[in-house]
A protein has these predicted regions:
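Cysteine-centered catalytic environments shared across enzyme families
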Residues: 1-160, 186, 282
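Hydrophobic (often cysteine-bearing) scaffold residues that line and stabilize catalytic clefts
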Residues: 59-66, 98, 122, 167-172, ...
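Adenylate-forming
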Residues: 112, 150, 172, 197-201
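Short, well-structured alpha-helical segments in soluble
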Residues: 178-181
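Acceptor-substrate binding/catalytic loop of class I
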Residues: 162-166
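Basic, alpha-helical interaction scaffolds
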Residues: 69, 220-221
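Mid-to-C-terminal catalytic subdomains of enzymes
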Residues: 185-215, 222-286
Length: 286
């Protein structure tokens, strides 16, 4: 559904409270005697705040389970489609990991795609990763003029004027446009969601304690449909492609949030951000 469909509705409807339907939920309505629809109840089936944190402190077991859950998240998405697959690859940890796992699981050639300005470090590192995993790689260079010219189309696609979201969406929108034009790929894997699940943003280093670290991860995940998922899903789907985001797999997220606060908190463990996934993958060297 798109908000653009509300543009031509009557003014009397605007006087009513219009809210966004929450993801992972079901609402029940019924006709009342006055011949209008009455809201009965909402049921939420999945929310990050409902996932319990357990005392999972045995690190070796945790690392093995992290890898297993992520591998299964990728595998189910690869196996459940017969359409041509491609991966977005920035050269960073998250997209590189997903691309490597897809390459392991996928039977056949895998095309990876990256985008950046001329001389971009992202393009260089994406090519290094592609060479390592053996994918057929496509680097798309974009100019500042093309970047700026696409902004109105991006805003129309994602239905948001949020400055950060729009800026972050341009690359996804542009590379999806190129994938549509230059290939037959229909299902696009990406590394989105990892920073929210694992506290990967730089400001997480400033968390006062591990409880605050956990609380902010859950808040970001609760609101992710307003920002990163909106950016990723709509930028890609606006070109007739289907996004696949394994880091937001329900079972993976539920398990990761069950790990004790302190073990997940890289600041507390004097480690790099997302250190658990780094160590989990290092053991398997995809």
């Amino acid at each position: 559904s798109e908000m653009k469909s509300l543009i031509n509705i009557g003014k009397d409807v605007y006087d009513e409270k219009i809210t966004q339907f929450e993801p992972g939920s079901v609402s029940t309505f019924k006709y009342s005697n006055e011949n209008y629809i009455e809201h009965v109840e909402d049921i939420t089936f999945s929310s990050p705040n409902s996932f319990s944190t357990l005392n999972n402190n045995i690190k070796n077991i945790v690392l093995e389970n992290i890898y297993k859950k992520l591998y299964q998240a990728v595998e189910k998405r690869v196996d459940n489609t017969e359409r041509p697959i491609a991966c977005l690859l920035s050269g960073g940890l998250d997209s590189s990991l997903i691309a490597a796992l897809v390459k392991q699981i996928h039977k056949g050639e895998l095309h990876t795609w990256s985008i950046g300005f001329e001389g971009s470090e992202d393009l260089k590192y994406a090519q290094l990763v592609a060479d390592h995993i053996g994918s057929i790689h496509h680097s798309i260079q974009v100019t500042e003029e093309e970047f700026l010219f696409s902004i109105p189309d991006v805003i129309n696609a994602i239905e948001s004027y949020d400055t950060t979201t729009v800026r972050a969406s341009v690359g996804n929108w542009f590379i999806s446009k190129k994938i549509k034009e230059l290939s037959n790929a229909k299902v696009i894997f990406n590394g989105d969601g990892a920073d929210e699940v694992m506290g990967g943003y730089l400001y997480f280093h400033e968390a006062p304690d591990s409880i605050a670290f956990d609380k902010d991860c859950r808040k970001l995940l609760t609101d992710i449909h307003y920002f990163d998922v909106l950016r990723s899903d709509r930028s890609i789907s606006s070109h007739g492609l289907e996004a696949r985001t394994p880091f937001l797999d329900r079972e993976f997220v539920q398990y990761y949030l069950s790990i004790s606060y302190k073990l997940r908190d890289h600041r507390y463990n004097k480690s790099a951000e997302k250190y658990l996934i780094r160590e989990a993958i290092e053991k398997h060297n995809p």
